[in-house]
Swiss-Prot record:
CC per GO annotation: chloroplast
Protein name: Ferredoxin--NADP reductase, root-type isozyme, chloroplastic
GO biological process: photosynthesis
EC assignment: 1.18.1.2
All residue ranges annotated as the FAD-binding FR-type domain in the record: 91-219
Reported cofactor(s): FAD
Keyword Ribosomal protein among UniProt keywords: no
Matches recorded under Pfam families: NAD_binding_1
Alphabetized InterPro entries for the sequence: FAD-bd_FR_type, Flavoprot_Pyr_Nucl_cyt_Rdtase, FNR, FNR_nucleotide-bd, FNR_plant_Cyanobacteria, OxRdtase_FAD/NAD-bd, Riboflavin_synthase-like_b-brl
Substrates-to-products reaction catalysed: 2 reduced [2Fe-2S]-[ferredoxin] + NADP(+) + H(+) = 2 oxidized [2Fe-2S]-[ferredoxin] + NADPH
Protein task: May play a key role in regulating the relative amounts of cyclic and non-cyclic electron flow to meet the demands of the plant for ATP and reducing power. Is involved in nitrate assimilation.
Species of origin: Nicotiana tabacum
Positions of NADP(+) binding: R174, T235, V266, A267, S296, R297, K306, G334, L335, E373
Record localization: Plastid, Chloroplast
Length: 375
């Protein structure tokens, strides 16, 4: 039986002054699936890069899910009973290597978001839902003679990484750029040091990593048919990409047969992150995956205002509350500003149903169904 076997192909080409790619012909490396091994030859294609500040190398990934799940190794990564924590600390970080930097968003997206693959050679294992700390090069201007502070990033891959060999980790990073409110001009002195370092990095660059850290967003897998409701904004989708790859892409001992429901909030279509990957899961696993997008600059809510994730939550509130009553886990990840609106919506829905949101939230936390990681 034939399967769509393409999992990931990367091609690195220098950026021209007009920020466009050369015509490239490439061939995939061998990818091993749980039932066979395949080679795929790709015809010549044109890849047009959106204008990017990265003037070094961008590695574009052709990445799709496949119903023939990908074999992963080493399976010994499944053996640990507890998640790895703080293997490397700020005073003695691990020096990893940048593998690739890929611009994820289109030209109409406000801002730039990059997918960054880091090679740790298997020395910095992690679980889905954990974070790495990154220490950018240079001196901390507030503490002369000291390195920059650690910046935490939730990992956007499974423990096996995008190469499925347990040697890489992926980060989803939005470049932080500061614009003067009076002049409207960029002030580079106030730009985010770490995000710009990562988005400007090129293959072969070294990066200091700490961690892994975090237990709040770990994916509970004791019940294979559990329901997981994921609500993310922007780069907050990172841990959910890891969850979904583990559920639907990788051949792992934990055979997921429940429901995963992703709500993703971004500005517009060009801002969607990993959308092709999620759409493929939707097509391949319609009984196990639901995917709802809230595009604030393109969609309207039922009151005629901008569409945010809390509006989607309210739209499906009866289903969501029923699933929570049945034991579903619910996860929130993104900017801190997302939570007040979401909490207000959940409280309003609960009151409409004749319930106390405070009591319900307390019970969800007690049952370890409530997971929040905001920054």
């Amino acid at each position: 039986m034939a399967h769509s076997a393409l999992s990931q192909v990367s091609v690195a080409v220098p950026l021209q002054t007009d920020s466009s790619f050369r015509r490239s012909t490439f061939k995939a490396t061998s990818i091993t699936f749980s039932d066979r091994s395949s080679w795929i030859s790709m015809p010549p294609i044109d890849l047009k890069a959106a204008p990017s500040r990265n003037q070094h190398i961008v590695c574009m990934s052709v990445q799709q899910a496949s119903k023939a799940k990908v074999s992963v190794s080493p399976l010994s990564l499944e053996d640990a009973k507890e998640p790895p924590l703080n293997i490397y600390k700020p005073k003695e970080p691990y020096t990893a290597t940048i593998v690739s930097v890929e611009r994820l968003v289109g030209p109409k997206a406000p801002g730039e978001t990059c997918h960054i693959v880091i090679d740790h050679d298997g020395n910095l294992p992690y679980w889905e839902g954990q974070s790495y700390g990154v220490i950018p090069p240079g001196e901390n201007p507030k503490k002369p003679g000291n390195p920059h502070n650690v910046r935490l990033y939730l990992i956007a891959s499974t423990r096996y990484g995008d190469s499925f060999d347990g040697k890489t980790a992926s980060l989803c990073v939005r470049r932080a750029v500061y614009y003067d409110p009076e002049t409207g001009k960029e002030d580079p002195s106030k730009n985010g040091v770490c995000s710009n370092f990562l988005c400007d990095s090129k293959p072969g660059d070294k990066v200091k990593i700490t961690g892994p850290s975090g237990k709040i967003m770990l994916l509970p897998e004791e019940i294979p048919n559990a329901t997981h409701i994921m609500i993310g904004t922007g780069t907050g989708v990172a841990p959910f990409r890891g969850y979904l790859r583990r559920m639907f892409m990788e051949s792992v001992p934990t055979k997921f047969n429940g429901l995963a429901w992703l709500f993703l909030g971004v500005a517009n279509t060009d801002s969607l992150l990993y959308d092709d990957e999620f759409t493929k899961y939707l097509n391949d696993y319609p009984g196990n995956f639901r995917y709802d997008r809230a595009l604030s600059r393109e969609q309207k809510n039922n009151k005629g205002g901008k569409m945010y994730v809390q509006d989607k939550i309210e739209e499906y509130s009866d289903e969501i509350f029923k699933l929570l009553d049945e034991g579903a886990h619910i996860y929130f990840c993104g900017l801190k500003g997302m939570m007040p609106g979401i909490q207000d919506t959940l409280k309003r829905v609960a009151e409409r149903r004749g319930e106390s949101w405070e009591q319900k939230l307390s019970q969800l936390k007690k049952n370890k169904q409530w997971h929040v990681e905001v920054y």
